[in-house]
């Protein structure tokens, strides 16, 4: 059984150029994404307290994402980059959330699967940023570590879904959402942002 997500569309090189042209803005957005990821994991705990089998993993993920926020903030602070005054709307996340079914059971499945896809996209993009950071070895190492961590998170949300839904249903819906994510990523404009 496979828990990882193979993205259907690779990030284009123009995205990396956009990020490298404004690394401070990227890092501000990255910090916001880590805060949101931590909050998302904890929102699963709050919304689904009866799903006791996954609560420990969700708490662990929430804490890890908050540690990532702390780490990116330390790198920002060292470089004189402040946190953004407000968290901007993320058209990528909004586009994905629009794909969620509305009935509570299927929405739960969709949110888990979208979390996997988002984490896998983050891992792919952290790898690209890492590979582009030739002049800052410290930041390069940081993004290398994040790339491996985010890849792991992509797997755990699929595993969580498989605890509550039949394998066929999970993978069919994962493939649908993954294809839709690929189309979304190809049509969004490039920004100095993670998504």
Regions found by a protein language model. Name each.
Residues 1-195:
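Non-heme di-metal
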């Amino acid at each position: 059984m496979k828990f990882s997500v193979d993205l259907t569309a690779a990030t284009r090189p123009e995205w990396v150029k956009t990020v490298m042209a404004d690394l401070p803005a990227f890092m501000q957005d990255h910090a916001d994404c880590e805060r949101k990821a931590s909050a998302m994991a904890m929102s699963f705990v709050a919304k689904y307290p009866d799903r006791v089998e996954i609560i420990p993993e969700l708490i662990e993920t929430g804490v890890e994402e908050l540690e990532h926020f702390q780490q990116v903030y330390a790198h920002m602070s060292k470089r004189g980059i402040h946190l953004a005054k407000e968290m901007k709307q993320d058209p990528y996340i909004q586009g994905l959330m629009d794909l969620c079914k509305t009935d509570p059971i299927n929405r739960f499945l969709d949110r888990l699967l979208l979390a996997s896809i988002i984490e896998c996209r983050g891992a792919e993009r952290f790898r690209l940023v890492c590979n582009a950071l030739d002049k800052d070895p410290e930041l390069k190492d940081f993004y290398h570590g994040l790339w491996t961590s985010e890849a792991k998170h992509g797997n755990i949300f699929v595993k969580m879904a498989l605890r509550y839904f039949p394998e066929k249903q999970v993978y069919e819906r994962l493939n649908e959402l993954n294809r839709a994510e690929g189309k979304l990523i190809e049509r969004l404009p490039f920004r100095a942002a993670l998504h």
